[in-house]
């Protein structure tokens, strides 16, 4: 009887964990609203999330070698995901600090063949002060649904190496596998 009770409790505990984990993935933590310019100087805002089933938002900076190294892989993912109505946006966290930083970011993106939007956040703006400034490890990536909610925790490190995690979250949002 003790063995049976232990088995039942263990099953309940495991079920509770997986259920809680799934709840965390579909929680409604809003991605902060923003209205910024991209690296090309065009306006972009958080309204863009509504145009796609999901959006991958990748934070990087000019001094991050691993961020720059993954850009061709992100471009490849962007091209593949476009067909599934999934967008990818980069955020060059230091590109808004000076004209020199912006020019460096533009050079990097051109050299790496990046065609997806890249935001150049204003370091004096709320988006930067309330969210971007708190990111301490690069690259850091978020998955955002069409309502502007973050799905799951941040993904730190190379996105392609964590593609299973990305695909799981995208499947929760889109129902696609």
Question: What are these model-predicted stretches?
Answer:
Residues 1-3:
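Bacterial N-terminal signal peptides that target proteins for export
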Residues 12-16:
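C-terminal motif of bacterial Sec signal peptides marking the signal peptidase cleavage site
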Residues 19-47:
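N-terminal "domain-start" segment that seeds a small globular fold
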Residues 45-68, 74:
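Short active-site neighborhood of thiol/selenol oxidoreductases, capturing the structured segment around
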Residues 61-66, 93-98, 122-126, 150, ...:
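Solvent-exposed loop/turn segments at secondary-structure junctions
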Residues 69-112, 123-129:
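Structural microenvironment flanking redox-active thiols in thiol-disulfide oxidoreductases
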Residues 106-140, 144-146, 155:
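Short, internal strand/loop/helix patches
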Residues 143-177:
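Thiol-/selenol-based redox modules, centered on thioredoxin-like
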